[in-house]
Swiss-Prot record:
GO terms, biological process: translation
Cleavable signal peptide: none
Record-linked Pfam families: Ribosomal_L22
Matches recorded under SUPFAM superfamilies: Ribosomal protein L22 (SSF54843)
Name of the protein: Large ribosomal subunit protein uL22
Any GO molecular function: rRNA binding
Cellular component terms (Gene Ontology): cytosolic large ribosomal subunit
Protein family (similarity comment): Belongs to the universal ribosomal protein uL22 family.
Assembly notes: Part of the 50S ribosomal subunit.
Keyword terms, alphabetized: Ribonucleoprotein, Ribosomal protein, RNA-binding, rRNA-binding
Function: This protein binds specifically to 23S rRNA; its binding is stimulated by other ribosomal proteins, e.g. L4, L17, and L20. It is important during the early stages of 50S assembly. It makes multiple contacts with different domains of the 23S rRNA in the assembled 50S subunit and ribosome.
Domain of life of the native organism: Bacteria
Name of encoding gene: rplV
Amino acid sequence: MVSKASAMFSRIAPRKARMIADLVRGRDADEAIQLLSFTQKSGAPVLRKIIESAVANAQQAGADIDALFISKATVDKGPNKFNRRWRPRAMGRATRITKGVSHIVIEVDERK
């Protein structure tokens, strides 16, 4: 039984979040939570909370939480319309500072 949890518009760059998603994809859910608890990357707490939410969703649906593994972990780029600022540049110009926004989706499934 597939259970899903997502976090939209997370204020983390997609490239950094993908590194963490690649780290946990295919692992057991409890192993991934344990691994992310000790990972020093900036996106680790965000992904850990999403995995915990997906496990709780699976438990609500009646799945065996000891048999859960992360079947799918995707990180997509969100819109850059939030958190835009301007940096002064030479000759009266300005360049835009954009902060990355991510859409993170985690799916857990039971091992057969």
